[in-house]
């Protein structure tokens, strides 16, 4: 017995795999969307149902509202209907969707009309779309209908147009999550004609409907809303396709408007102007703020917050990018977003001002690359500092030029005009002021050069004897030396103050960026979304999260976004290491400065935390699955030991009785003991057969040969096998089985079908010992339905699906009633043959098991 038990445990090795991997594939949701009642949504749904029925799909109708329309009711003919469930409320009975009946029937496709319907109080779920979610979770495809006025996000707009508040609403995300949304469109004039002909409402309601809700203006507005809403969904699908296929070329499939803001007083005007431009072409509006990487041109958080609130209220999205050259950063972002129009602010500038600084707008227009640029003027923009808009390279060159030009200009003015009015002290003060100006512009080094040049010019042109490098008076020498020393000292102080100001602004901007990225994580963004935000902010071609495990020669790509991403550290333009070098954030694009790397190091740490958090969640899920598998394995071992112990004990008692010499058994007693032994062996044989079949199913080695199988022959062979005791020991119950399958033929594997029927009939005989078991069959379109019906105790409602789980038997509350693999094996065999099997209540009591198999293409 020990060896047999070990062998059986070995047989169940594949069960761990099966338990961990058995999942139910979620059904698909298809929605017919309409602008108003009567456009033909239900009619289109029924037409799709007939097309699927012609292809051999198992389609049933659970809820179809015909509203008294004859054409719709006629189209419902030929479709199996699941009766509604009636709910009593305030003395009346209301029909509702019977979710449990749908789950018991378990068709491939079910029709559920009016997805936004509110269920009668007392129902399990308050809304019908929640019922549909349960059906989808069971792996059943649902086809439904929705009117645009029922979308919760558009409810107030529809009420404003029609003057009618819609009580029944459905969240927008439910409809957006549908696998397919098809618009059923009809012109307002055609819909009004249909209404006038009585094809929508009864005759007594037509006049009121035409003069109220179904006015031409209302229908036109609702139609436009429906078309625009669906266009948004198509656009989202297109963006997903472009991202999946890594397409970067601009597709002007839709207008997109980008507006650049600084956070200053002109920003709100720019956003409103861009919103008007976008609304005229129904374009998407994006607001972008460029953060200067050098820390200049900072803006306060409250100012930028007001711009963000305005953008959100206008339906725009807010974006932040980093770049030292603002026009380049704007154009890169616009191209990345596939924008067609760019709105920038500009100020009125004099000719002299344009000579030194063209302005961001003018520089942006020079290289738009196919993007239409709108330059909007605003009085407040003229007060902005032009120096802060200069790039670091331009500012560096300008400061060194100022170090040469400012002392020269001061010297020329002093020699030509001021020398006659001022002494050496006043002239030194002028040069001192010039050095301070250079220090403010460029820092210590240009200021030192300016101080040196100032001293030389002061000595040569303004100190006696003039036009020589000789200093005759000691006071003049001291004055020049003090000038140089004080100029350099003050330049150091000024440069330090300016540096601290820039650092403070840079720190504020870094904090703003960190808050931006941290906010994405807190809002539940996944790793790919975070990397996309990094790529967008720093104008990178691609961003990759790489993991280099200890001892590995190559890295593992955890996630990547963009085109042509880096796959190793050496090929990256910018590489950010995290912690112990296990994670790297790799960037392909422009090389980032050290100041940007500080922020990215913190972001990369957040990204690594997301990876580890995801891994911990997966490990927790695996641990839970293993725990469930261990629990099921313990249940299996307990059940197997019970099923083995009972027949072995009976056989042992019978053999011991026959071998005893103390009692002389009559021939009848001997025959009975031998029958007990045979019956026990039959039970063991059936148990081992089911175990082996389950093991084969778990290993995926079942390869059915589908041919024409005559059900009369299959049922008779199953009854013979039961009578011989191959799968059970209720030989005396064979006469209780009534067969009425006629000449039905199914496409099946004859051997597997015999095993399925034998298991189901044997199960019915076991649990309905005093009742008739009926087996009947019939063809329904392109399917053959086989019913095994008993009138026994049945099972509690809602637990029918549990019968097909491994180790489950009717009425099980513990693991002491047996293995219960027969029904599980039956489902595995049926599904291997491309069919389905389900259980439902027998009217009057009992259990009915329905096998659904394909029918041959030609009728015999």
Curated annotation (Swiss-Prot):
Record topological domains on the Extracellular side: 418-428, 498-510
Cofactor: Mg(2+)
Reactions listed under catalytic activity: ATP + protein L-histidine = ADP + protein N-phospho-L-histidine
Membrane topology field: Multi-pass membrane protein
Source domain of life: Bacteria
EC number: 2.7.13.3
Modified residues (Phosphohistidine): 642
Major enzyme class: transferase
Disulphides: none
UniProtKB keywords: ATP-binding, Cell membrane, Kinase, Membrane, Nucleotide-binding, Phosphoprotein, Transferase, Transmembrane, Transmembrane helix, Two-component regulatory system
Membrane-traversing stretches: 397-417, 429-449, 477-497, 511-531
Gene Ontology MF terms in the entry: ATP binding; phosphorelay sensor kinase activity
PTM section of the record: Autophosphorylated.
Family statement: In the central section; belongs to the universal stress protein A family.
Annotated function: Member of the two-component regulatory system KdpD/KdpE involved in the regulation of the kdp operon. Functions as a sensor protein kinase which is autophosphorylated at a histidine residue and transfers its phosphate group to the conserved aspartic acid residue in the regulatory domain of KdpE in response to environmental signals such as low levels of potassium ion, osmotic imbalance, acid and nutrient stresses. In turn, KdpE binds to the upstream promoter regions of target genes to positively regulate their expression.
Protein name as annotated: Sensor protein KdpD
Source organism (scientific name): Mycobacterium tuberculosis (strain ATCC 25618 / H37Rv)
